[in-house]
């Protein structure tokens, strides 16, 4: 079974496309959306989709994704089931779940993610994605926007995502490496470029570069203001 966990906060624009990309995949799967107190029409989007389970949790990706994992466990997720953490602005490719169903019978496959690119044709965003994919190939640390998947039993054993405001995916990825080497699948997830264009593409590029330097060389982390919400 694949449990898709989507943290949301004011994602009315991108969420319908993300949900569509999930519901077009072959079963079996369950979709759990964990909302952090949206003030837009995100909850209306959820109410229109009867195939989706949802709950509330304190705002913050770590808090919301951990809540989704607990929800899956309460719904009898087994240790070998996949937990797939999907950002609300990121769409799965066709064939994503076939890959996961294929890996399910391989006990050596414990975690992984997908290659990444942004929507649109902006060459600077393509460069960011290329750099990010290269980084992942070298470090084996899966970022949140790469649709991280991990066995439920291993996720629980590791204690879930660390409760911190930023870089929870990076820290979890480092912890994950102590137990397994995540697989980078050849399929590509697509993240809506709207937020990154609004933030400023060069700012986005610098942010990715600084995160890579933090991961690869242990440079200090950055203030939460640097990772402010852009809607």
Regions found by a protein language model. Give the residues of each.
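Short beta-strand/loop segment that forms part of the nucleotide-sugar
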Residues: 6, 20, 28-37
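A conserved acidic beta->alpha catalytic loop
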Residues: 35-43, 89-91
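Short aromatic/hydrophobic "clamp" motif used to bind/position activated sugar donors
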Residues: 83
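Hydrophobic helical membrane-anchoring modules
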Residues: 174-231
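Short, well-formed alpha-helical segments that are part of the catalytic scaffolds
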Residues: 10-24
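Conserved donor nucleotide-binding strand/loop of the catalytic core
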Residues: 43-71, 75
């Amino acid at each position: 079974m694949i449990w898709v966990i989507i943290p949301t906060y004011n994602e009315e624009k991108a969420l319908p496309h993300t949900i569509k990309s999930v519901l077009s995949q072959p079963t079996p799967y369950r979709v759990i959306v964990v909302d952090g107190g949206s003030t837009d029409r995100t909850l209306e989007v959820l109410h229109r989709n009867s195939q989706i389970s949802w709950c509330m949790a304190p705002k913050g990706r770590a808090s919301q994704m951990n809540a989704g994992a607990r929800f899956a466990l309460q719904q009898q997720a087994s240790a070998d089931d996949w937990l797939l953490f999907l950002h609300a602005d990121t769409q799965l490719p066709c064939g994503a779940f076939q890959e996961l169903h294929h890996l399910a019978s391989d006990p050596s496959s414990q975690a992984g993610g997908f290659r990444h690119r942004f929507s649109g044709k902006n060459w600077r965003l393509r460069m960011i994605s290329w750099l990010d994919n290269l980084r992942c190939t070298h470090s084996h640390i899966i970022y949140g926007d790469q649709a991280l998947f991990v066995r439920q039993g291993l996720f629980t054993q590791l204690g879930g995502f660390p409760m911190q405001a930023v870089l929870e995916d990076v820290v979890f990825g480092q912890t994950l490496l102590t137990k397994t080497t995540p697989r980078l699948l050849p399929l590509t997830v697509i993240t809506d470029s709207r937020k990154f264009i609004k933030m400023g593409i060069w700012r986005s590029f610098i942010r990715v570069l600084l995160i890579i330097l933090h991961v690869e060389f242990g440079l200090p982390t950055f203030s939460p203001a640097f990772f402010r919400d852009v809607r």
